[in-house]
Amino acid sequence: MKQNGKINIHGPNLCQKMEDNMKLLLVSPLASKSFLGGDFYFRLPYLGLLKVASLTPPNWDVSIIDEKVESLDLTQGADLVGITAMTPAVNRAYEIADSFRSRGIKVIMGGMHVSKMPDEALRHCDSVIIGEAERLWDKALNDCKRDELKSIYRHDNEYPSLANFPAPNWKLYEGKRYLPVHFLETTRGCPHNCEFCSVTNSFGGKFRNRPVDEVEREIQDLKPFEGRFVLKNVVFFVDDNIISNRKHTKELLSRIIPYNLKWTGQASVNIAKNNEILELCKKSGCMGLVVGFESLSQGNLANMGKTFNTPDTYIDVVKKLHDYGIGVTGAFVFGFDHDDESVFDRTIEFVIKAKIDVCYFSILTPYPGTRVYSQMLQEGRIIDHDWSNYNTNHVVFKPKLMKPEKLLDGFHHALKESFSYTAIFKRLWGNGTYKNFFYPMNFGFRQTVRKTIKNKQHFSYEEDPDS
């Protein structure tokens, strides 16, 4: 395998066992068309590849390239390349895989998209990890060393336990130009199975919890970010619902109080019903929560399976969180079957009246593996099969109550009006939340919104012959 002291990356048995450490390159591709959030959003560190790196045995030399913050050299050598990508970045992922395979380098792909579209992915890679990497990654690496790599690795029946979870090695991200946020995971799974969301299909319909002791040890090992940052110890809990298990949440929040963190996460509207958890959020340093309001229409909420959301209570939910000093990032989706052209102005009016700290608007996007994707495919409503457009900024389907062009125009209108200077100050004034966090976030989004609208592409939305 070695010639003149260099690894021969063109040999036929690239993954046979070697005495020396083998070189593993992990890649996170950049989507050709950005999500809303632009540079601000994309400079957040990606936890997925750090977790894969932590599962890799020490006899592999691991490096990570994240195209959000650095360039990938497609001519570099490696014994194995691992690539993970969300749907809008998967075309770029396939380009990268094709390039490395053309030089005889084995490629393994993972992530939500290829887990739902493995046959598509296998046209570009040697192997696909379906589902979560735990208990599968080490098998794939061992098979790779024996040159016996299988095309598919999947869990048999149950999802892996989150106990004995290896902590991510944040040293692999040192020197990279990320925003100063540490990502932590404490739970996986969701029982709600909303029609547009792929979490339940990917991670199961039950909540699985990491032992709080392990989460606390990971927090103890975090190092404050260096540099001229106002907040140096910010944590984002990536759990889809931080209050998924009330007992686990209470123990976790109680344990992290002494660490003087500032943290954010995601929660359902039901958090407003639990004063004890809200008080623990406040004491443990919660700056804000992403709350999935999704829609102002009860009909839409019923269709998507989110019946515990009731629009009549939304303003009270926001006020309750503000009473505890917790900011609210309100997530709304446009394009559901009960949405007509009035939805945009109604939502603009609501977010200002409710004093939502940050608005996160998106266009309904039927991702593979979701119920809405299967339904729209069956109904012939999908009009765009270019995965790079599946980024929540484009319309890839035929809405029921408006034309695709009107959905896109209304989306841009809602963004522009909600992130005007006047709207920002109306939303944030008097909230009692972390201004040195939410004002910069709003101005960052405002800049991205202006860029998004300025570079707006005009689509004809002709019928897709493949739909």
Regions found by a protein language model. Name each.
Residues 29-35, 120, 192, 247, ...:
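Flexible glycine/acidic-rich beta-alpha junction loops that bind and position SAM and/or redox cofactors
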Residues 26, 83, 130, 237-239, ...:
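Conserved beta-strand positions
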Residues 21-228:
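Acidic, low-complexity intrinsically disordered segments
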Residues 2-29, 58-64, 124, 143, ...:
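Radical SAM enzyme core and accessory elements
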Residues 166-329, 336, 342-345, 349:
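Radical SAM [4Fe-4S] cluster-binding motif and immediate context
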Residues 108-109, 129, 153, 264-266, ...:
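Structural detector of well-ordered beta-strand residues that form the stable sheet scaffold
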Residues 64-68, 84, 267, 292, ...:
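Residue-level recognition of beta-strand->loop/alpha-helix junctions
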Residues 120-139, 280-290, 346-361:
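Structural recognition of alpha->loop->beta junctions
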